[in-house]
Curated annotation (Swiss-Prot):
It holds the Pfam family Ribosomal_L14. This is Large ribosomal subunit protein uL14c. Its main location: plastid. It comes from the Eukaryota. The lineage of its organism: Eukaryota, Viridiplantae, Streptophyta, Embryophyta, Tracheophyta. Transmembrane segments: none annotated. CDD domains: Ribosomal_uL14. GO terms for cellular component: chloroplast; cytosolic large ribosomal subunit. It comes from Pinus thunbergii (Japanese black pine).
Amino acid sequence: MIQSQTYLNIADNSGARKIMCIRVLGASNRKCAHIGDVIIAIIKEAVPNMPLEKSEVVRAVVIRTCKEFERDNGMMIRSDDNAAVVIDQEGNPKGTRVFGPVAQELRQLNFTKIVSLAPEVL
């Protein structure tokens, strides 16, 4: 569960390393984000000489969470870290590579570009 003030690792090569969630997009009273949800975040750590810089406000989609996620068939999905991918306004990733596994639920949520860039789909 990702809520406000939660730090996430970035799982792509867009130039950001860590972000801090400031808002979960969706309903106005929504408190937590899960896999596949879009958040608004601030970049806290960035790679030098890259397009994204520290303290920039970006949109990101959550691809892995430490909190377990239950599928319809009863299978539980859990990861070692909270990770996200930086996206633009249309939902396309800003990076050209995605590191680590992603959940297959992203394909159903129309993030097919992220799924196609990922090395493994769970």
